[in-house]
Every structure is written in C-alpha cells, then in structure tokens.
Amino acid sequence: MEIAGTYTFNAPPDRVWNILMDPQVISSCIPGCEAFEPLGEDRYKARLNVALAAITGTYEGTVVLADKVSEKSYRLTAEGQGRPGSVKGSAAVSLRPEGDVTVVDVHGTVQAAGPVARVGQRLLAGVSKMMMDRFFACLQGKLTS
C-alpha cells in the first residue's frame, strides 16, 4: 500500500534537515516509541508500542536512513515484528525551499504480514498516515520551541 504526505516547516532546509537527522528528536517524535538505539551509522534498533484498533501491540525492528543528500533528500526503511504481525516500509523523503519555509514530501510503501495484515488495507493506510502526521507535527513543534 502506498502512503504520502506533504509537510511545511517554518524554517530553512538546513534546520529541517538537522532535526530530521537527530536520533534524539526522531525517537521523541515517533508515536509510541519506547526505544531507539544506534546499531551503526544511520541504522537504529527501535521498539514501538502501538495502541490503535486491531494493530495494537509492541513491534521491534530496525530503521535505516540511506541515500542521503544533505538538506535535499534521503530514503528511510523500517521493518518490525510483533505479536500482531510484521510491518515493512520504505519512503523517499525530499526537502525543498519555498520562500521562507521548507516543504517536506514523503512518498512510500507499507507492507504488513500476519494478523495485522488482515485488518484491511484501508485501516492500515489510515493508521500509517496518522502516525506520519503526528511525527511531522511533533518535529514542527521542536523547531518552533
């Protein structure tokens, strides 16, 4: 299933890039993140507790940031497993200046297996988009505080 979002930040690309690359900020903004530990350069072990409808559960997995072009783009891949099943996702993230703001575009895919996949693509798509919206809203808050 495909997911996409566009987010506007009241900051220049360098500030937005720096916050997107900061593991402490990332972990504090991922909804339900209980752990986010470095495994090496741009690779992290994560544990999320998701409490939403039929996909409620704890997921453990990895997050990797790759193909980085400073202040312009990167690719994020994540995969995790938990009692409700497994989830794998990948997203292209791009930044572009527009006047005094920076626009971040996200285009990706999410795949699920096991019981979590049986809840239906619409529910999973909605939950994925909601978590992504919360993540970027948190980042915007970090930039303005």
Sequence positions of predicted segments:
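Glycine-rich portal/gate segments that line the openings of hydrophobic small-molecule binding cavities
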Residues: 37-79, 134
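Hydrophobic pocket/interface hotspot
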Residues: 16, 26, 65, 106, ...
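Hydrophobic/aromatic beta-strand elements that line small-molecule binding cavities or substrate pockets
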Residues: 5-7, 34, 60-67, 78, ...
